Amino acid sequence: MSAVDKTNNLPTLDTLQMVISDVDGTLLDKHHRFHFRTYRAMKYIREKYPNFPIVLATGKQRSAVDLIRIPLDLDAFPAAHVNGCVLYNKGKIVYADHLKPEVVMEVVEATKGNPNIANVVYDEHYVYALTPGREDMKNVKRLAEIGEKVDFSMPCEEAIEKVKSGEIKVIKMAVCEDPDKLDVVRDILGKFPREKFATTQALEFCIELIPSNSNKGTALQYITSNILPEVKNENVISFGDGQNDLSMFAIAGWSVAIKNGMPIAIEKAKAVSRVGNEEGAVGEVLERIFNIPEDYTPPPYTF
């Protein structure tokens, strides 16, 4: 926890034009379920202020956040996926950035000496394993368990060939290893020139590689510049728990870190939630800002 109590440092509703939020560790609990308190708060906003944008900014692909997007009808607004490398508006892709195939293969080559490292790549829809890693794809399976759409039907060798040919257009790459061995991955990736990719981390068992020019901050700037130009950055409130949320925190006028988030997120955010994601952190903050009545009962959450 930050040495300074930032739990009450929140904007007033009349100064806000948009909410933008991370997903894992922020909207979802440790079991990767949408917390009811947060669903309730966001549903209230959708009902009372139907034109108030609620934007998802996540490392996940669009298909992996259906449990949030569909019940709240968030296709009405833009969304930033794969750490800002893919932007949607009204459910359609309006921008996508990609890693070069040769860069992906250089990382595969650099990590092949460690058979415990699993390399996976993301396109707009699926995740593909290029190398299996520890204990028969243990960490790849962990991605599937948190909602990532992993294509287990495609052999690693086939996926590699499709990356090389450009048939699989790679938006993000993840280098996976057990959390206590992840420093080995950092050492390997640290030898690459910065212009080849940027690294970030949202999950404890992998380092993510994305195009150097894309992140959640650039996604937010694109949205307010090109899709919702009436929204000013200083009137945006952002929520997040990890390192990959810092670029978004830097652009948004208001930033809220989750109480049990990464120390760097708590340090950099203007505010911190009173409770963690297990207790509906985002919902708790929105209740205060939007003055949500205690007796408000949303429609049943169904997905």
UniProtKB/Swiss-Prot annotation:
EC number(s) recorded for this UniProt protein: 3.-.-.-
Major location category of this protein: cytoplasm
Keywords: Cytoplasm, Hydrolase, Nucleus, Phosphoprotein
Modified residues (Phosphoserine): 63
GO cellular component, one term: nucleus
Coiled coil: none
Subcellular location as annotated: Cytoplasm; Nucleus
Molecular function terms from GO: magnesium ion binding; phosphatase activity
Top enzyme class: hydrolase
Family: Belongs to the HAD-like hydrolase superfamily.
Protein name (database record): Uncharacterized hydrolase C25B8.12c
Native source organism of the sequence: Schizosaccharomyces pombe (strain 972 / ATCC 24843) (Fission yeast)
Source taxonomy: Eukaryota, Fungi, Dikarya, Ascomycota, Taphrinomycotina
